[in-house]
Amino acid sequence: MVVKPEWLRVKAPQWQRVGSVKELLRDLNLNTVCEEASCPNIGECFYQGTATFLMMGPACTRACPYCDIDFEKKPLPLDPTEPQRLAEAVVRMRLNHVVITSVNRDDLADGGASQFVATIEAVRQRSPQTTIEVLIPDLCGNWQALDQILAAGPEVLNHNTETVPRLYRRVRPQGNYQRSLELLQRVRDRAPWIYSKSGIMVGLGETSEEVVALMQDLRQVGCDILTIGQYLQPSPKHLAVQAFIPPEQFEEWRRLGESMGFLQVVSSPLTRSSYHAEQVRALMQQYPRQRPAPSPLG
């Protein structure tokens, strides 16, 4: 058994503030990936009044052995009121930046793209000053569905590659590394004004050389932002941690990624794909992109 090192211990949150966020989420019947995936940063994020909203859940149609989200082959139908409830939460929490993600919905023809579009539109209507980041699944390679999401105009589109290609069969058996790269390439080709983002976990048995090769693959498809964090085993039934990577290695990857041309690399043991995501607003000011008037993608 690999013993968890001191650098992975987090401070206890101030539960009064955390409780108020949880109360709001329960009031609006919303799920968060913070809770469903047992994120170690939940206390810090809830204390700061931020959350990553999990749509179309809480059950997922894939059973990835690293993930703590419940598996359900046939989840409940989509709730048409969810986009408006999520937009209401954005207003109540006064969010400058919102991260919206979802479970995999392989049971739906469009993978849930229409729900992403409806939610982006609802947030735009209720809180036009809020920048929107969507963290999407691979949509089973349905690129028309991806185009629908891109046309809705989120500022950031995130799709996590999760791990190095050698480990996909064990870590992400229903995923496909090349399909994930193609998704990110299509974001760059179809909507170059959108900031693209991806994230990976380490500590699953990959080598540093494999991580560097993955980073190079992401740059080749035009990925702008990269997050790297330590994998933590949610329960004994999930994949075991193979190694706890020291903070110095994360810092080395951060420096290397910046030298490769990523606009931002967030790399530390406790980094998760949505951790401090609001910092992208400063990045957008530093590297502005001209967004054309809304129109269907041709």
Swiss-Prot record:
GO terms for cellular component: cytoplasm. One of its GO terms (molecular function) is lipoate synthase activity. It is found in: Cytoplasm. Its cofactor is [4Fe-4S] cluster. It comes from Thermosynechococcus vestitus (strain NIES-2133 / IAM M-273 / BP-1). The gene is lipA1. Keywords: 4Fe-4S, Cytoplasm, Iron, Iron-sulfur, Metal-binding, S-adenosyl-L-methionine, Transferase. Binds 2 [4Fe-4S] clusters per subunit. One cluster is coordinated with 3 cysteines and an exchangeable S-adenosyl-L-methionine. [4Fe-4S] cluster 2 binds at residues 60, 64, 67. It catalyses: [[Fe-S] cluster scaffold protein carrying a second [4Fe-4S](2+) cluster] + N(6)-octanoyl-L-lysyl-[protein] + 2 oxidized [2Fe-2S]-[ferredoxin] + 2 S-adenosyl-L-methionine + 4 H(+) = [[Fe-S] cluster scaffold protein] + N(6)-[(R)-dihydrolipoyl]-L-lysyl-[protein] + 4 Fe(3+) + 2 hydrogen sulfide + 2 5'-deoxyadenosine + 2 L-methionine + 2 reduced [2Fe-2S]-[ferredoxin]. PANTHER family: LIPOYL SYNTHASE, LIPOYL SYNTHASE, MITOCHONDRIAL. Its EC number is 2.8.1.8. Pathway: Protein modification; protein lipoylation via endogenous pathway; protein N(6)-(lipoyl)lysine from octanoyl-[acyl-carrier-protein]: step 2/2. CDD domains: Radical_SAM. This is Lipoyl synthase 1. It holds the Pfam family Radical_SAM. [4Fe-4S] cluster 1 binds at residues 34, 39, 45, 274. Coiled coil: none annotated. InterPro entries: Aldolase_TIM, Elp3/MiaA/NifB-like_rSAM, LIAS_N, Lipoyl_synth, rSAM. Residues 46-263 form the Radical SAM core domain. Its main location: cytoplasm. Belongs to the radical SAM superfamily. Lipoyl synthase family. SUPFAM superfamilies: Radical SAM enzymes.
